[in-house]
Amino acid sequence: MAHFVVNNFTVETILSNIKSGSIAIPEMQRPFVWDSSKVRDLIDSLYKGFPVGYIITWQNPDVKLKDGTKSVGKMVLIDGQQRITAMAAAIVGQEVLDEHYKWKRISIAFNPLEEKFEVANNAILKSSKWISDIAPVLEPAFDTFSFVMDYCQKNEISDQMSQINNIINRLRSIQNISLGVITLDSTLDIDSVTEIFIRINSKGVVLSQADFAMSKISSNETYSGNITRKTIDYFCHLLESPEDLKDIKNSDTVFASLPEFDAIKWAATKSNPIYKTTYNDILRVAFTYKFKRGRLADLVSLLSGRDFETREFKIEIEEDSFKQLHEAVLQAVNQTNYERYLMIVRSTGIVRKSLIRSQNVLNFGYALYLALRERKIDSNEIEQIVRRWLALTILTGRYSSSPESSFDYDIKRFFSYDDPTEYLKLTEAGELSDAFWKVNLVQRLNTSVASSPYFNMFLVAQVKGHDRGFLSTQVDVESMLENRGDIHHLFPKNYLTKNGVPQSMYNQVANYVFLQQEINIKIR
């Protein structure tokens, strides 16, 4: 049995459905990643009748309302967002956001004499042979006859009036071009939809479950999902590009007037290279801590109103899930929470991002911190639990593979006890037993990879212990990590080589030590 249907819709119909909200396209409010030349090429392909690829939508499940009736689920666009945004920009004249959150127009010009498209520029604007912007030509009320008369007169080609008229009509017919739209069935779960996307997508672009979740969030304006998404997006962007605060404020005045904007604008005033979060990170942290689950597929189900017991989709579950997620996101972007967590991270000895190989170590640590605060655990105890858990997860590589399963398992176990410390103690006893220290760790030190988590943990421990660098009298390891330091062989390389020790032995991390650069130069 097929889990999808294929229909053909005209460009005009698709853009109309986007405008009416029948198809949700959340990316319209996010930076447009295509350059203008790609927009030109897309319009050129439509004009020439070349295929431009399928548009893929996912029919959201029908939701059971409180009165027992059902609301038909909205279609969410999961592939084709850039193409549709490009068509809306060129054909309808819709502005797009650039990477700095500034609105701009992409004007595609057309030369009827050469039947050629170009991105509008100053030379084109001055030329009578070019239509500097095709959007007005594609409007329903456009007067083709008057335009052709005027165009031919300006360019002294009255004998080509019939030909130019046909070309302009062909240009206007772009809106009638049919595109294939694949609609995935509402019964498919998010894992299946992800797999389908990966198999269909010729470019091999992996659409993550966070992408699905974010699309689901922003497409629901009824429960302010669009505000939740903007809170996440803008916060993460400001951490990376604080100089864009003013542009965001000017380009989205409605959001700038909301308390959510006040809650995130602090991110433009702080710079912290240790924990710069992406939308994936904030979404995972907020979901894990608030819902005590780790699989983002479950978040999509909850936001669709799924009752995991009855397997029905209920409006009250959908409403409550959006409300809880919004609250969780505000806690995750809260300045006090964020900075206090970073203080714990630094007090653990983690003073540089490179000391952690997996961002998910910090993500779970933050989710755990927020969840413990919500449980109203004593602040000193929270710090101890989080520090110990960070150390454990770095040493064991706990979130290096299958992080969602590990997140789900750990967050549920932590809060299945009246005292969350119990799960920490049990995990330490199992994962960091005498066998780990006497056998496993010793074997894992048999590596020459300087980014080894075990060597990194050694540096973390040195920072925690305020140790000075090797052969240093004043400068500590923390200062060298934050500024400039070198890795050197504890037992000199030349000495070991002369005594027959092979490279595979003398380059092991157990023979590495961190020291000042100038001392390293003198030793050489």
Each predicted region: which residue ranges?
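Basic- and aromatic-enriched surface patches that contact anionic nucleotides/nucleic acids
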Residues: 2-291, 353-356, 386, 392
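Non-catalytic, well-ordered alpha-helical scaffold segments
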Residues: 12, 36, 40, 85, ...
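Flexible loop/turn segments at secondary-structure boundaries
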Residues: 62-65, 493-498, 522-523
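Histidine-centered nuclease catalytic patch
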Residues: 80, 477-511
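Short helix-capping/linker segments at secondary-structure and domain boundaries
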Residues: 95-96, 203-207, 370-379, 463-471
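A cross-family structural signal marking well-folded subdomains
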Residues: 258-440
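Intrinsically disordered, low-complexity N-proximal targeting/linker segments that flank membranes
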Residues: 394-487, 495
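Short Cys/His-centered divalent metal-binding micro-motifs
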Residues: 506-524
